[in-house]
Amino acid sequence: MERVEGTTPNEAAAAVADGEEPPQGPPALDDDVRTGAAGGNNLAEDEAGAGRPRRRWFRRAALALLIALLPLLTAETALYVNYQGDPAQGTHTRNRDALWLGHAWVDGRKKDADVTALARRLQGTGIRDLYVHSGPLEHDGTLPESVYPRARWFIDAVHEKLPGIRVQAFLGDVLAGEGADGMVLEKPDTRAAVVRSARQILDTGYEGIHLDLEPMPSGDRDYLTLLDALRRETRSRDAQLSVAAHQIDPLPALHTVFGLFTDHPKWWSQEFFGQVARRVDQIAVMSYDTAQPLEGTYGGYVAQQTSLALEVTPPSTDLLMGLPFYWESNFDHWGHAETVPAAVRGVRLGLSRTDADRSRFGVALYIDFAATEADWRAYKEDWVR
């Protein structure tokens, strides 16, 4: 006799003799057992059931990530497309370019032979202005004369070996913010001290003031007030006033959104950029440290920045676009992407599309002590020609 689960052979025979039907199989599973609950014995279904929520979670997470990245991917694609096309003929140097120089030129480290080498390097280029670091300013706006002891020597040496090239004093400081010490432009005494410092260093023989105060918030009225005062001073002495400018919002009001998360401004509104440009003789856009991951997107970004700046810079002001004459590799500046060839091509594309015949236009090279032979070659071959 076939063994029936839960019944011995003798019990089964006795049940038949009494006229009873023996059990024909295991009892039906109740709902708890079917679902594996309360001591159920369905391990395979248990595991399958546990896997389904995990798969759903991963799908939802992937979808959420895609939705979050979609605006960024769209923007990067637009920048890459902006890098396509051919620059117009003639979009090359207008002989109004500039070069940022380090502090070694005015503190005694550089010698006559260095000036001779610099003159040889700049021969046949479009560079007309040198922004030589002569500060920094103190947080109260003052400038110790001890920080530029060899300025007069350098100015005279440049005039001798590079006639026609102007030497401007590159002055800057960090602005107070995010709990850090720095210059407070809201203080009238500080602004007055900056003007006195400009007057003091112009007495040394510099032909202009190049101001770089960072990080400068978009719309800062105290900054505009300072520029007005400096412009009166430089004009009275037939000197130049130039500034290093933040990049312009690549998307409308992006500086406002960015400001919700940090007190360290990166962009200016296009309107504020124009307000600054109308107060100076030269405005140099720091069009590097963009965090762009590819040459194509970086070049497209520079093309966009060039167009945005051209739209609001008056024809009487020199507009210069910064070129990255240095190598770094970090989140803000990917060295493989932010190259001189990509920047020059971007500048030419933006110029071609917006104001190809603009005469008061150039590029500014940052910075002499970090530049490579490849940087100089790209500048000369792609921009100077």
Give the location of each predicted region:
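Aromatic-capped interface at the extracytoplasmic side
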Residues: 77-91
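Chitinase-like catalytic core of GlcNAc-active glycosidases
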Residues: 89-115, 121-124, 129, 133-277
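N-terminal Lys/Arg-rich, disordered targeting/topogenic segments
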Residues: 1-58
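Conserved, mostly hydrophobic/aromatic
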Residues: 130, 211, 283, 321, ...
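Hydrophobic membrane-insertion alpha-helices, especially the h-region
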Residues: 60-78
